[in-house]
């Protein structure tokens, strides 16, 4: 179970990308930054810099399923972006269901009294942390059960 993981969690939105990372043990996800989107080239440059700085070996991207559990137009856009990024950076890609992660992020920030309705970037960063933490928890339980890979 001691497989090292250096994952980067992404909450991809139209205006911003929340980013989270994890410690080498794969136990704890932490919000890192929020990328304000401008162009694909600039987005990828910022993600690439984080990947290199943190020796990332995997991308975990939140997939915004509809409340009915289907892949809608927003999820398709996120998949297209995530596949391009993963391919360009030569990294494996995993998806996590991100339904309600922004609501949960906002609630967590309010509970910690770190919330301002104007700080959407902090919400995106917290949502990325939630997405990555859920993936890490799922991975850990899967490894404890004797599996090696999660479903992609």
UniProtKB/Swiss-Prot annotation:
HAMAP family: Nuclease_YqgF. It comes from Synechocystis sp. (strain ATCC 27184 / PCC 6803 / Kazusa). SMART domains: YqgFc. Belongs to the YqgF nuclease family. Could be a nuclease involved in processing of the 5'-end of pre-16S rRNA. This is Putative pre-16S rRNA nuclease. GO terms for cellular component: cytoplasm. GO terms for biological process: rRNA 5'-end processing. The keyword Nuclease applies. Pfam families: RuvX. Keywords: Cytoplasm, Hydrolase, Nuclease, Ribosome biogenesis. Its EC number is 3.1.-.-. It is found in: Cytoplasm. GO terms for molecular function: nuclease activity. InterPro entries: RNaseH-like_sf, YqgF, YqgF/RNaseH-like_dom, YqgF/RNaseH-like_dom_sf.
